[in-house]
């Protein structure tokens, strides 16, 4: 017997979700001669679930989902003895941007920034989050710390390549971000990882912004 949830596509292009129970049908001789399926439409419930873990402005994952999924990612990586990379970032001088360009323009920056992060991810095991305000994070896995740093630098470049003018940014004429990167074997990660990444982020800010500080 197989039980699970399936995402399907309607002819009109809309998606719908079903919960399915599939079990084999046997002949008198005990051979499988077919399958029977029971399906329940759970689209409304799935939409509510998705809304509860999605940031309303940017449509990327929110802080609630970060708090839920991050420990699971770490525990899964521990079983496989893998590295986990946590890239914590903050848009440089965002308050100055809001004060001078207006909150509507500020919201547009937040949306473009989030879209850039999401489009920079390559694998289903990589996650982008808006943690609140102008704070974002990416959780991803790389084979080596060097590759993790390389990917973080790609993210930083992609953000500046958006070419969103920010006359009040001391680091660049455009929107940029300061970042703190923690890349460790999952078995060496403890509950201080968020604070450690936050400390690195603010070290990046103190050092001139638009840069990445990495754990030793």
Features from the language model and the residues they span:
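PAS-family sensory domains
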Residues: 7-16, 26-27, 30-41
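Sensory-domain boundary capping and coupling elements
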Residues: 20-22, 39
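Catalytic-core segments of nucleotide cyclases and related cyclic-nucleotide turnover enzymes
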Residues: 28, 103, 145-153, 169, ...
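Conserved nucleotide-binding and Mg2+-coordinating catalytic segments in signaling enzymes
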Residues: 49-68, 89-103, 111
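Short regulatory alpha-helical coupling segments
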Residues: 50, 63-83, 114-122, 141
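Active-site-proximal alpha-helical element of nucleotidyl cyclase-like catalytic domains
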Residues: 105-125, 135, 154
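A short pre-motif secondary-structure segment
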Residues: 127-130
């Amino acid at each position: 017997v197989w039980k699970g949830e399936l995402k399907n596509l309607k002819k009109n292009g809309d998606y719908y979700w079903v919960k399915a129970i599939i079990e084999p049908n046997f002949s008198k001789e005990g051979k499988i001669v077919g399958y029977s399926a029971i399906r329940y439409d759970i689209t409304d419930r799935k939409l509510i679930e998705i809304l509860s873990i999605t940031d309303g402005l940017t449509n990327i994952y929110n802080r609630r989902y970060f708090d839920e999924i991050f420990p699971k990612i770490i525990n899964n990586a521990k079983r496989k003895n893998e590295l986990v990379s946590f890239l914590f970032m903050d848009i440089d001088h965002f308050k100055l941007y809001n004060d001078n360009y207006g909150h509507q323009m500020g919201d547009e920056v937040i949306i473009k920034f989030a879209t850039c992060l999401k489009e920079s991810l390559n694998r289903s095991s990589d996650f982008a989050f808006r943690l609140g305000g102008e704070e974002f994070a990416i959780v991803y896995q790389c084979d080596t710390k060097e590759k993790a740093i390389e990917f973080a630098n790609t993210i930083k470049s992609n953000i500046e390549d958006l070419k969103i003018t920010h006359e009040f940014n001391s680091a660049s004429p455009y929107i940029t971000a300061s970042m703190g990167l923690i890349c460790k074997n999952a078995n060496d990660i403890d509950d201080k990882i968020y604070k450690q990444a936050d400390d690195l982020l603010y070290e990046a800010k103190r050092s001139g912004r638009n840069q990445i500080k990495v754990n030793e």
